[in-house]
Amino acid sequence: MEMSSLLERITDQIAPLRGSGEVADYIPALARADPDRFGIAVAEVDGGVHGAGDWEAPFSMQSISKVFTLAMVLAEGDDTLWRRVGREPSGNPFNSLVQLEHERGIPRNPFINAGALAVTDQLISLTGDAVGNLLEFLRTESANPALPIDDEVAISERAHADRNLALAHFMASYGNMRNPVDDVIDQYVRQCSIAMSCHDLAEAGLLLARHGVRRDGSGYLSRSQAKRINAIMLTCGTYDAAGEFAYHVGIPGKSGVGGGILAIVPGRCAVAVWSPGLDRRGNSVAGVAALDHFTTLTGWSVF
């Protein structure tokens, strides 16, 4: 089946799920999102880009940004990150303080909030301006030089960052924070507030589908680094539902509470879906279902 027709079919199949779930309400600016919206885009390694539904509508990327900050730190050749952050699934909520205390300030993986704060902290040390460098990178890889930071979301998220502040201060108490906590939180909420469409996100995700090669053909990550990021996406990318996601979808994916999910079929394509209604674990209800349909209909999987 031709890809555009396939995406239209998937959009029709998940129609009953549009409006399901709950929008993220702990960030007031996200609580106003329309749960009925849905978009899907596929960017193929040979250059084809296809979409259906609200695939050009921008949304807050939130935790999906963690994929790219991790890539940027590893691209600097700085493997010291792995002394500060683990690579194991957490099995706990993404903002858990209990697990961080149990493991003495070392986050379980780079995609839970504590781990992502450590990655942003490391990127600040490496570049001086984590969010500025991330935004420039995403604008280039998405071929959209106008990608913005949604200031309304950033301000709202910063005003309700108590849990992330607690995580960062807790890590600092164990010596696992290099920069001032307030600076790290400021950069972190701004990186999460970058607004991208499914189209933009799928284009940017091709970095991992191409095994670390940028859109201009230059190498950015080694093949091994890209493989490892994809592996962590598969095992840790959908909060404490990673096992269910791997079982049903079967490809690496990273979700965000803005309702987006970036998924990678290595060597083939990057897929981005968006629908703001979330399940109790913080993953898009319609988005996960759409990716399940996508891998079932294409037969593409890493297994």
Curated annotation (Swiss-Prot):
The keyword Hydrolase applies. Keywords: Hydrolase. GO terms for biological process: glutamate biosynthetic process; glutamine catabolic process. Substrate binds at residues 63, 113, 157, 164, 188, 239, 257. This is Glutaminase. Its EC number is 3.5.1.2. It comes from Saccharopolyspora erythraea (strain ATCC 11635 / DSM 40517 / JCM 4748 / NBRC 13426 / NCIMB 8594 / NRRL 2338). InterPro entries: Beta-lactam/transpept-like (IPR012338), Glutaminase (IPR015868). The lineage of its organism: Bacteria, Bacillati, Actinomycetota, Actinomycetes, Pseudonocardiales. It catalyses: L-glutamine + H2O = L-glutamate + NH4(+). PANTHER family: GLUTAMINASE. It holds the Pfam family Glutaminase. GO terms for molecular function: glutaminase activity.
